Each structure stands twice: as structure tokens, then as C-alpha cells.
């Protein structure tokens, strides 16, 4: 078959036109939670491309602009005459109203931010089974002043006259609030009403159908050629390894580069798990001394990241040449990576990057642009939670699927200041105790991340009637849904006490343990 044939994938049932909203990805995730496939595309998508995709429904996202700004983002006005159901959210609703002859007024004292109860004015397919006075999440300045012909007001709030509108004949709808946000009580109900009742989508986007559709597509793309995968042990690369192994078997070679900054026992665990237990070919590359030598005397965190990234590139080049030749490079690129790296450079037909570039390898630096690989990125349209489901369906155990996120530079950026083997050994032991006690307490799966940080100072202590001068360890445990925001975890004091006691008694050169209770924002999850 031709190259074009294997690139033909499932078309999205719902298209999301992105006008710069911070919630565009969230809209897509919420729709996929209804088992309906959706993609985020540029607001500049052409009518021809929309007709080619033939979606069952279109959502116009929110955005930070005012529709009256000189360079405010727009879409082709003909979109409203396609006969395809459209839901405008916040800015998307305001744009629809303005383009169809209504009017929007700038914010004055009636701007709305946060929770607000909506009052339902009349029945509508969009608000079916949504309770009156239910709470919705508002975040807008401008408001609709006058509706276009054919539209009705179906809900309002205390400060917003047109909180929801509809044109039932043309199936055009709008909401001033954000149904995709968790704070909106009946937000998912509104999304389901639009997806199922109005757009008539089928709930056929499942983990099983994704795997069934993807495996033959991988086989068709790769043929009998060899594929190389840089394995990190995280959920993305591990899921990809299982998926590729199921699709092409021995044509896959995984390369695990041990740079010396992994957690205690992880290199041994990964080699045993993939190579011995599941018979997935993994080439182990011990590059510990190379990496630690490059970091000698380096204290700046950005320099550390850059050096680790550059050294990873050199090792990767050397080993791929030694093991190859390989025609394909497999990457665990996810859909948020595609959106964030492409910006507006997204193919409107597929939602994929127009100019494909090899992304940074787990935050440790990009691979060389001149590497002569073709890319295999079967996860590129999935979100993180979907990848976990695929991994589970393929047989990955919970210890991989539910593993806490771990930065590409590893422990090197959890040691503040210069990195050396003594500090690495110290931090590995302390970090293992943190995770061990969190798991014993049954809290591991309830926490986004739990780890230890080694500070580059020494503190005074007393141990065995003797004065000590040793390093302090910081405990960092946070709760989060996606890592974008996070709150410090309220670990019971008895567990914190047990962790601290074990660390100062079992870890050499540590005499103090402190707990970081900073949320994100203003802080970040990692210290470097």
C-alpha cells in the first residue's frame, strides 16, 4: 500500500476550533471521556478541510481576546451555514453572535469570574436534564448585548443576561460559561447533550478500538524495517514498547541509556521487566561515568539540563550507529506535545504537526535534526490518561502504569548544586524510603508525586551525643490531576515522622528532614 493509505486514520467526530483558550485541550479530553473522538485544530481551518473531515459537530473554544480587537482571531463565517451543529464557548459564543449580526459589549462592572448559578429560561436540547440554579464556572469580561435573528436566550445569571443561547433550527448553540471545567456542576451533561443528542455522535472511541486500529497501521507503515525506541521506563515509552512489540515483534529494538540519575533499583527492574519477563529486546547502555564527569563543577540547573541533553544525544548517536541501521525511530509523543510544540502549525485535516520535528526526549534535550529516521508516533493523538488505559489493556502492570512522573534528567535536578556519586547515593536511599513508606501507607496512588530533594548546604545536628554537620533532605509530596497545578499533600503526621526517622537513621550524611508545603503556583513541583 502507499504511504498515504497508512496515514489515513479515524476522522474526529467533533472538531474543536482553538481561539487561544487555556481550556482547549480540556474540552477535547472531556469529549473523549464520552467515548467520542475529538481533535483540536486551528481556528483558521478552511471550509474545504472541514467538509473533507465531515465532523458531526464543531466546538468554538474560548479565548483571551475581545471580538472587537483589531487582530482578534476569527473563523470562516461560512462555517455557520454548513448545517453542522456548533457550540460556542465563551469567546466562541461571542464570535458567533457578532458574525451572525448580533452585538457584544465590553466588560464594565458586570464581568464575571468564578462560580455562578444559572437560571434556566426555557427548555433546550443543550440544557436537557440540567438543574435550574446549578453552578457553572464563569470567566469572561465581554457579554452579549443583542442576539442575532433566530436565536433565543435559554439561560441567564445574575450578571449575565445571555448565559446560554440557541438557534434550534440551525443547531447553533452558545454558553458564556465553561462546561468543560470541573467546577461546572452539570458541565459534562451539557457536553453529552451536544455530543450525543444534538450532534448524534456514536460512542465508539475506546481503548480497544484504538488498539485494533493502530496495530495494523503500524505494520503497514513499517513493513519489514527495523524500529528503534529510546526506553525510559515511564508510562509513555513503556506503553509504546508493548504496542510496538505486539505489532512488529523482533523488528523492534529498545535502547535504555542509564545515565546514572535514576531511582534506586530502577535500571535493574526495567531490564528484568522488559528483557527477561516479556522478552522485549532491550539494549542496556551504561553511560553513568560519562554523564557524571560532564557535570563536574556544574551548579546551575539549566546548565545541568543542557549538558545532560547534549550528552544523551551523543550517546544515542553512537549507539544507534552501532546497533543499526534503523529506518524508523519510535517516540512516545502525546497529543499535548503535538499541540504545544506546533502552536498554530497544525494540519487542519488531521490535527498533526505540519513540520514534524523530533521532540525533546523526556525533557533532556532534542535529538539531532539530521538523524535519518522516519518517525513512528502511534500515541500522538492520545492524552496521558488514555495512554495509561492503553498500557493496561496491553498488559502493563500497575507498577508501570501508575508510576509517579519522573523528570528526564532524573535525580540530577533533585540534587541542588553540583552532582556527584556521594550525593546520588544519599538521595537514592532517601528517595526510596519516601516512596516505600508512602506505598506501605496505601497513599501512593492518591498522590501525584512523592520524592526527596537534597539541598546543597549542611546543617548542625546531634546524633549519639556528638555534633554532626550533614545534608538536609526535603520531602516533596503533591496532589494534582495533570501536573499543571498542584497542592501539597496532607500526609498524616505519623507517616511523616516515620519517613523522617528512617532517613536520618538509615541514610549516611543526613541529619535533618523538612517538608515542603508550597503549592503550584507559586512554586513548581520540582525544585530545579
Swiss-Prot record:
Residue ranges annotated as transmembrane are none
Query: What InterPro entries has UniProt attached to this entry?
Result: Class_I_gatase-like, GATASE, GMP_synth_C, GMP_synth_GATase, GMP_synthase, GMPS_ATP_PPase_dom, NAD/GMP_synthase, Rossmann-like_a/b/a_fold
Q: Which residues form the active site?
A: 90, 178, 180
The question of whether Ligase is a record keyword is answered with yes
Q: Name one GO cellular component term.
A: cytosol
| GMPS ATP-PPase domain: residues covered | 205-403
Kindly state which reaction or reactions the protein catalyses. Answer: XMP + L-glutamine + ATP + H2O = GMP + L-glutamate + AMP + diphosphate + 2 H(+)
Please name the pathway: Purine metabolism; GMP biosynthesis; GMP from XMP (L-Gln route): step 1/1
Q: What's the Enzyme Commission number for this chain?
A: 6.3.5.2
Give GO terms: molecular function aspect only: ATP binding; GMP synthase activity
**Residues binding ATP, per UniProt:** 232-238
Gene3D superfamilies, A to Z: 3.30.300.10, 3.40.50.880, HUPs (3.40.50.620)
Q: Name one Pfam family in it.
A: GMP_synt_C
Any idea where the Glutamine amidotransferase type-1 domain is? 13-204
Keywords assigned by UniProt? ATP-binding, Glutamine amidotransferase, GMP biosynthesis, Ligase, Nucleotide-binding, Purine biosynthesis
Entry's NCBIfam families?
guaA_Cterm, guaA_Nterm, PRK00074.1
* Function of the protein: Catalyzes the synthesis of GMP from XMP.
According to the record's subunit comment, the protein's assembly and interactions are: Homodimer.
PANTHER family of this UniProt entry? GMP SYNTHASE [GLUTAMINE-HYDROLYZING], GMP SYNTHASE-RELATED
State what protein this is by name: GMP synthase [glutamine-hydrolyzing]
Q: Which organism is it from?
A: Prochlorococcus marinus (strain MIT 9301)
Q: Which gene is annotated as encoding this protein in its UniProt record?
A: guaA
Amino acid at each position: 500500500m502507499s504511504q498515504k493509505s497508512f496515514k489515513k486514520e479515524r476522522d474526529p467526530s467533533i472538531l474543536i476550533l482553538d481561539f487561544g483558550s487555556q481550556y482547549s485541550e480540556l474540552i477535547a479530553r472531556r469529549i473523549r471521556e464520552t467515548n467520542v473522538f475529538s481533535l483540536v485544530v486551528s481556528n483558521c481551518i478552511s471550509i474545504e478541510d472541514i467538509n473533507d473531515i465531515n465532523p458531526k459537530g464543531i466546538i468554538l473554544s474560548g479565548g483571551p481576546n475581545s471580538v472587537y480587537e483589531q487582530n482578534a482571531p476569527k473563523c470562516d463565517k461560512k462555517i455557520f451555514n454548513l448545517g453542522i451543529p456548533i457550540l460556542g464557548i465563551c469567546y466562541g459564543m461571542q464570535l458567533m453572535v457578532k458574525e451572525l449580526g448580533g452585538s457584544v459589549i465590553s466588560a464594565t462592572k458586570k464581568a464575571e469570574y468564578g462560580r455562578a448559578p444559572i437560571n434556566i429560561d426555557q427548555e433546550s436540547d443543550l440544557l436537557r436534564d440540567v438543574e435550574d440554579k446549578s453552578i457553572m464556572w464563569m470567566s469572561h469580561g465581554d457579554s452579549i448585548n443583542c442576539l442575532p435573528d433566530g436565536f433565543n436566550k435559554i439561560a441567564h445569571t445574575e450578571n449575565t443576561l445571555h448565559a446560554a443561547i440557541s438557534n434550534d433550527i440551525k443547531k447553533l448553540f452558545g454558553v458564556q460559561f465553561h462546561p468543560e471545567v470541573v467546577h461546572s456542576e452539570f458541565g459534562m451533561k451539557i457536553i453529552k447533550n451536544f455530543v450525543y443528542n444534538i450532534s448524534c455522535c456514536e460512542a465508539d472511541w475506546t481503548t480497544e478500538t484504538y488498539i485494533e486500529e493502530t496495530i495494523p497501521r503500524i505494520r503497514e507503515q513499517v513493513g519489514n524495517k527495523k524500529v528503534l525506541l529510546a526506553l525510559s521506563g515511564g508510562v509513555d515509552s513503556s506503553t509504546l514498547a508493548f504496542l510496538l512489540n505486539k505489532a512488529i515483534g523482533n523488528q523492534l529494538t529498545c535502547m535504555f541509556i542509564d545515565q546514572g540519575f535514576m531511582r534506586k533499583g530502577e535500571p535493574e527492574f526495567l531490564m528484568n521487566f522488559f528483557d527477561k519477563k516479556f522478552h522485549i529486546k532491550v539494549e542496556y547502555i551504561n553511560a553513568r561515568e560519562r554523564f557524571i564527569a560532564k557535570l563536574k563543577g556544574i551548579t546551575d540547573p539549566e546548565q545541568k539540563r543542557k549538558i545532560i541533553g547534549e550528552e544523551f544525544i551523543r550517546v544515542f548517536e553512537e549507539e544507534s550507529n552501532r546497533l543499526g541501521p534503523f529506518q524508523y525511530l519510535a517516540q512516545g509523543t502525546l497529543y499535548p506535545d503535538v499541540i504545544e510544540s506546533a502552536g498554530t502549525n497544525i494540519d487542519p485535516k488531521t490535527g498533526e504537526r505540519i513540520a514534524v520535528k523530533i521532540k525533546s526526549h523526556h525533557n533532556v534535550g532534542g535529538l539531532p535534526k539530521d538523524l535519518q529516521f522516519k518517525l513512528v508516533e502511534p500515541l500522538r493523538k492520545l492524552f496521558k490518561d488514555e495512554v495509561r488505559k492503553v498500557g493496561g489493556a496491553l498488559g502493563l502492570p500497575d507498577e508501570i502504569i501508575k508510576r509517579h512522573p519522573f523528570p528526564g534528567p532524573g535525580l540530577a535536578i533533585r540534587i541542588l548544586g553540583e552532582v556527584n556519586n556521594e550525593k546520588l547515593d544519599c538521595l537514592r536511599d532517601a528517595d526510596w524510603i519516601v516512596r516505600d513508606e508512602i506505598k506501605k501507607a496505601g497513599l501512593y496512588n492518591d498522590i501525584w508525586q512523592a520524592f526527596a530533594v537534597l539541598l546543597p548546604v549542611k546543617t548542625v545536628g546531634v546524633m549519639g551525643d556528638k555534633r554532626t554537620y550533614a545534608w538536609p533532605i526535603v520531602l516533596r509530596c503533591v496532589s494534582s490531576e495533570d501536573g499543571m497545578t498542584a497542592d501539597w499533600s496532607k500526609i498524616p503526621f505519623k507517616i511523616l515522622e516515620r519517613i523522617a526517622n528512617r532517613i536520618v537513621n538509615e541514610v549516611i550524611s543526613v541529619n535533618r528532614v523538612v517538608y515542603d508545603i508550597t503549592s503550584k503556583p507559586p512554586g513548581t513541583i520540582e525544585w530545579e
